Amino acid sequence: ARVSMGLALAACAACAGMRHKDEDPPPQAFYTVTAEIALARHQPRIAALQYAAAAANETDVQLLQRAAQVAADCLQPSLAAKVAARWTEVDPQSVEARRAAAQAALALYKIDQAAGHYMAVLRSSPKGTDAEFAALEIYLDGNDNVFGARQLADRLVGAFPSSEAALRVQGFATLRADDPAAAVRSFTAALAMPAGEHDNNDSAHRELLQSLARARIMAGDAEQPLAQAQNSVERDNTPANRLDYVLLLMAAQRDAAALQQLEILRHNTEYAPVALRLLGLIEFQEGHLDAATARFADLLRTEKYLDDAFYYLGLIADRHNDPEHALRLYAEVQSGENAVPALLRATTILQTHGAAPAAEELIDRLVEDEPGRAPEILTASARNHVEAGDLPRAVAILEQAATEYPDSVDLRYAIASAYEEQGRIAGSLHELSELLKLRPEDPAAQNALGYTLADHSRDLKRAYQLIERAYAAAPRNSAILDSMGWVLFRQGHIAEAEPYLRAAYAGDGGGDIAAHLGEVLWRLGYANDAEHIWAEAGAADGDNRLLKATRQRLRSTQQPSAPAGQPASPSKSPAPSPATPPMRLPAPTVN
């Protein structure tokens, strides 16, 4: 019955655009009722299409607002943009209509349009410019389009150059977009503003100072911010000051010092949960699974951060090849940012242990329960099929998902990757090229196409140019650093590739980057260093297929000798520029 209703609604949506021009349109209620039925039946595309049809010639502001909200909630920004355009036409003074138009434009990477709408919001909102910037800061912090958010913030600062609130937004956006040097400039400028809101708000001022210190560390200037934070602890030994110091040590990847400070902090009753959480995260990141288990078990006893504790204990059980225990632990993760990853990992366990129907049922439930993350969930489902060797099924899932969410960038990337897995390199490159046409200034799209060209030794000159543009926009992004190193390797510049790959690996020690760095070290004659990198990454990402294949391929070849006149091991410099990789761990709050 559900399938039949879905087909009927789909036919209604299709027919809405196929009527003869002389036919009377259905009443508005037809569209809104069928849209609400589609929502109840978890058919987001149909719901958004029906509401967009209802809004096309509508003057009822409440209906237009509902249509825009449904399109946005259903992850249909192209439809949301059309509805918002109609809404602003009907009510040109509506701040809400402008905001809806801005958010849709940002999702479509139409940055100039987004900036234009946001400028109208900021200038006309009855809440005031600073309040709107504060709301925008929160919105962008939860937006996955980090490069678009950064470019939007840059444009808004151009329009509001004397606004501390605008500079705050820019600082946080550039930091999330892996350009810490630019973030330093923004935070410094914000703090240099004449007496304003931050002077009357101690917590906001403290946050700006801490963010500036973190940005400086990530940009390669670690010593002074760390010394200042240490002095603050010595001068005023409060738990809050010590936590700030810990977070900066973590940003600088000085884990041993951070662990020492956290051991002190965990004896404070109020701060013990956050200290135990961070202790567990650091031990987990370092591969000390027994120590991490003890920390997270202690965290459970505090009855704080329970979802985090269960999630990481599940990952540890997973690493120990104890799937039944892992599944029980993942099932305890009830909410928060790790809830969906826990259940997705559970689907992988079920799929790989002969319970594919249960995995599919869990995926269906997840899509219904978390509609705002449906593309991510469906991509994970396809990945399970790739790992199981069922590429046709994976591609079918992704292509069907793309018809439901045609604006999803993540699905486009996943389709390109699946085509590549099938050996359809031309199809993969076409998909990425089309995406870049839609988002020509998106560093992620530039990097994806550039890397794929380089990985298959296609048009290396263009590959380098694309990656170079992405690198200029996000010089501390691990994926882009990896691509830069890999295209240099493909061009034969092996020694020049090493520092980029080292910087990438320092920021993200995943298997793919380890495979690339290890191969470069191997080709340079440093087989022992390559083996060390592979072993280190294998402990955390042992199922990585590229890592396994690279190790096997190179071990079957004769090891090259280290170049004459060079030291026994390569340079340990962490980056091609004097910058420290971004912080790997989240900065929690005390709860």
For the regions a language model picked out, list residue spans one by one.
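N-terminal leader/linker segments that initiate helical-solenoid repeat arrays
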Residues: 15-69, 73-78, 82-85, 89-94, ...
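Structural marker of alpha-solenoid helical repeat scaffolds
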Residues: 23, 57, 90, 124-125, ...
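Residue-level recognition of tetratricopeptide repeat
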Residues: 36, 69, 103, 137-138, ...
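Register position in tetratricopeptide repeats
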Residues: 40, 73, 107, 141-142, ...
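TPR alpha-solenoid repeat register
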Residues: 63-64, 97, 131-132, 166, ...
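Canonical tetratricopeptide repeat
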Residues: 66-67, 100, 134-135, 169, ...
